[in-house]
From Swiss-Prot:
Classification of source organism: Bacteria, Pseudomonadati, Pseudomonadota, Betaproteobacteria, Burkholderiales
Alphabetical list of PANTHER family matching this protein: COENZYME PQQ SYNTHESIS PROTEIN B, HYDROLASE C777.06C-RELATED-RELATED
NCBIfam families on file: PQQ_syn_pqqB (TIGR02108)
Keywords carried by this UniProt record: PQQ biosynthesis, Transport
Name the record gives this protein: Coenzyme PQQ synthesis protein B
Pathway(s) it belongs to: Cofactor biosynthesis; pyrroloquinoline quinone biosynthesis
Record SUPFAM superfamilies: Metallo-hydrolase/oxidoreductase
Role: May be involved in the transport of PQQ or its precursor to the periplasm.
HAMAP family, per database record: PQQ_syn_PqqB
Length: 305
């Protein structure tokens, strides 16, 4: 049986964010709000054996692995369950964890689109840096709907679904989008036939993305911001949620309305920004999600597929 383990459920910076004193961050530090700290988003896919696919390598990966003993099978003096890494994009909070995995015993298999590999080869040259350590064995993911598998987890079929979003701020293509800058991931269990759709960064939901969401048994999607002006209103940033490539949860056409139209048995939000009021467990916003049957991911959450 395929299982999705949420290693990290927060957006970039984690929760609480190191330099933030918003209501949520200050409250969780002081213990004055009902909220649980979270690390930066990443998941692990496992099957019946000990091996796992790491999807996105968070800067918090070492802490996340310590909190997931099953990902250290201890079959040898140096060991890990991580058989390969799949990247959804080249964002800082999704790739810098690769540096923490540099002691891997051999070249680490890395699956990413050509656009992401291009950014990691030049603008943020992780592939060149890691060539002096374990090295990376890169595999370019197709963006045409062709399914692929990652050995030794051959019971899983994965498909990269191009999304309309933005390349990282450091990328020379930030304002010249390419297919594959950001993907969603269709995850299918060959034995059960069940599927999940994972997309921690969703800026716009067009017809083909909605079709993916609608066909999935489980959706694990972008819950970054509650409001489009969430960063602007308190003066944290001049950018809206849409400017940063995220569809806000509330409001007309927001993620709540999208999820309301889906038949999925579980609808789960991930990549939650530290400012998002849904992090407070007794907030009106969290209650609204519950009324719509929407869950909020947390570190250590296990999702059976």
């Amino acid at each position: 049986m395929t299982s999705i383990r949420v290693l990290g459920s927060a957006a970039g910076g984690g929760f609480p964010q190191w330099n933030c004193n918003c209501h949520n961050c200050d409250g969780v530090r002081r213990g004055t709000v009902r909220a649980t700290p979270r690390t930066q988003s990443s998941i692990a896919l496992t099957g019946d054996g000990p091996d796992a696919i790491l999807v996105n390598a968070s800067p918090d990966i070492l802490q996340q692995l310590r909190q997931a003993p099953a990902l250290q099978p201890a079959r040898a003096p140096r060991d890990t369950a991580i058989a390969a890494v799949v990247l959804m994009d080249a964002q800082i909070d999704h790739v810098t964890g690769l540096l923490m995995l540099r002691e891997h015993r051999e070249a680490l298999p890395l699956y990413a689109t050509a656009a992401v590999l291009d950014d990691l080869g030049a603008a943020f040259p992780l592939t060149r840096i890691l060539s002096h350590y374990c090295g990376l064995r890169t595999h370019a993911l197709p963006c045409d709907g062709t399914a692929f598998s990652v050995p030794p987890l051959d019971g899983l079929t994965l498909t990269a679904i191009p999304l309309e979003s933005k390349a990282p701020p450091y990328s020379p293509n930030r304002h010249a989008p390419r297919a594959g800058d950001n993907i969603g991931l269709r995850i299918e269990d060959r034995r059960s036939g069940r599927s999940a759709f994972y997309a921690p960064g969703l800026g716009r939901i067009d017809d083909h993305v909605f079709a993916e969401l609608h066909s999935a048994d489980i959706v694990l999607v972008d819950g970054t911001f509650w409001r489009d002006d969430e960063m602007q209103a308190p003066g944290f940033s001049g950018k809206s949620a849409a400017d940063m490539g995220h569809l806000a949860l509330s409001g007309p056409g927001g993620m709540i309305e999208v999820l309301e139209r889906l038949p999925a048995s579980r609808k789960i939000l991930i990549h939650i920004n530290n400012t998002n009021p849904v992090l407070v467990e007794d907030s009106p916003e969290r209650a609204e999600l519950a009324r719509h049957g929407i869950e909020v991911a947390y570190d250590g959450m296990e999702i059976a597929l």
